[in-house]
Amino acid sequence: VQVSSILPPGCRFIPKTPAIREIPPGAITFCVMSRCCSNEPGRLLVASVGCAVPADERAYGYISEHHAFGQTGRQAGDHAEDLAAAMLASTLGIDFNVDESWDEKREIFRISGKIVGTRNVTQSSIVKNNGYTTVLAAVVFVF
């Protein structure tokens, strides 16, 4: 079940393998998902979700979804993180310019003391001849 882009307070990130053991086959789960698909041969596809985590564990963070054609995984991942950080920064009263370099943004985070960090999950692929390709990236909530 796709949900909003809010990272609930107190959420912890856990690796995929132990998380999968917590979800029985066929279970309905909550997620924030990005998906991109095409059947155009040679087309570069990418899907990414980015997370921005606040320093205050009682506060909520943000999760962004981003999908594109022609971007590398690194470009899409950085963009997804920037989107999530910009959403969180706006709610915390931090002036955040997505066009600044990562080093400048990291310094803003450090000085503000309000954002712990960002991360992303990204998948990319090139469409093969005579086929259809879908890339998917998701944050899945385990309760």
Language-model region placement:
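Helix-coil modules at protein/domain termini and other flexible surface or pore-lining loops
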Residues: V1-F143
